């Protein structure tokens, strides 16, 4: 030790009793131990911060993956689908599950998605060979496919064929993540992600405002996580914030044609939930519900628009 002065050293000698005890422990105790209860994640799993208000939802997802070979996490854009997926992944890994994550885009086919999962060998190009390889090599794993709503129509049929074949071969289980509507996944068990409860949504706003003010903002933005994170104190009403207005108009409502937007605005003006049959155009209710734009009462008798959409559209209509 340089400049550390003299250092006293103690030497300890094993007794005969200690030697016997040491020998009885065996050689394995000399090797570093790796916890057998921890799984591994492969692929480009997104990084997330602290997750609020999703514990019950994650428990429901854990139950679904035990009961079904596949299911889908779905909901509005920005509602926290990927966040829930990553939080679920962390729980699965902690329980000893190996999983592989792949994020889709408009050009992805099944082979491209698998190539992003760090599989140990070059993938076979033949349909049957690839299915059998994945089913055998990854039998006890879970594959997570994010943004499946981006898959193009020309790749969807082959994607579903692979998934079906691997299920028949008792291969890895699948978790799909995507925004509604997801017509091609109608056959898959669904877990819809709702807005956050206001008591949890306020946690996204930090502690810089009074509790009552934070609750007001979270309520006006419908407990929508991304909208709350986009909020900046520049407008009298949270829903009039320019970033939030642009997000709802350009992203959330981007899948609706002009006629559907017109019918949506009839619901915007309603002061309270109504029965679906009493809507201005009851046929449009199904379209909006497929896109996760509606909130239903507990008995599913009445519906209204998601609060984020309702308040933002009302604000833009009064300009």
Predicted regions, residues:
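Conserved P-loop NTPase "ATPase switch" module shared by AAA+ and STAND
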Residues: 133-158
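Conserved NTP-binding/hydrolysis module of P-loop NTPases
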Residues: 108-128, 135
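Conserved catalytic segments around the Walker B and adjacent sensor/switch elements
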Residues: 90-108
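Amphipathic alpha-helical "lid/sensor" segments that cap RecA-like P-loop NTPase cores
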Residues: 198, 206-250, 261, 299
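Walker A/P-loop nucleotide-binding motif
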Residues: 68-85
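C-terminal leucine-rich, beta-strand-based interaction scaffolds used for sensing/assembly
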Residues: 275-319
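Winged-helix-like regulatory helical subdomains adjacent to P-loop NTPase cores
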Residues: 237-282, 286-287
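N-terminal pre-P-loop "Q-motif" helix
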Residues: 47-65
């Amino acid at each position: 030790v340089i400049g550390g002065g003299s250092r006293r050293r103690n030497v300890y000698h094993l007794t005969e009793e200690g030697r016997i005890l040491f020998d009885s422990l065996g050689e394995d105790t000399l090797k570093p131990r790796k916890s057998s209860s921890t799984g591994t994640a492969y692929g480009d799993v997104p990084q997330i911060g602290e997750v609020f208000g999703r514990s019950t939802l994650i428990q429901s997802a854990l139950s679904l993956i035990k009961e079904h070979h596949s299911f889908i996490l779905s909901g509005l854009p920005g509602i926290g689908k990927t966040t829930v997926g990553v939080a679920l992944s962390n729980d699965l890994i902690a329980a000893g599950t190996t999983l592989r994550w792949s994020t889709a885009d408009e050009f992805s086919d099944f082979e491209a998605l698998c190539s992003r999962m760090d599989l140990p060998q070059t993938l076979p190009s033949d349909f049957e060979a690839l299915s059998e390889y994945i089913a055998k090599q990854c039998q006890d794993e879970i594959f997570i496919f994010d943004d499946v709503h981006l898959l193009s129509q020309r790749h969807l049929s082959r994607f579903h064929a692979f998934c079906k074949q691997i299920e028949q071969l008792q291969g890895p289980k699948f978790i799909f993540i995507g925004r509604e509507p997801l017509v091609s996944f109608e056959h898959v068990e669904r877990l819809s992600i709702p807005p956050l409860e206001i008591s949890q949504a306020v946690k996204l706003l930090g502690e810089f405002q009074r509790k009552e003010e934070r609750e007001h903002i979270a309520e006006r933005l419908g407990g929508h996580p991304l909208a709350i994170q986009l909020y900046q104190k520049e407008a009298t009403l949270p829903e009039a914030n320019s970033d939030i207005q642009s997000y709802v108009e350009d992203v959330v409502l981007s899948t609706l044609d002009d006629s559907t937007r017109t019918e949506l605005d009839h619901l915007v003006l309603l002061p309270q939930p109504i029965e679906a049959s009493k809507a201005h155009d009851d046929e449009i209710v199904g379209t909006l519900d497929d896109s996760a734009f509606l909130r239903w009462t507990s008995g599913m008798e009445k519906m209204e628009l998601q609060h984020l959409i309702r308040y933002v559209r009302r604000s833009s209509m009064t300009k």
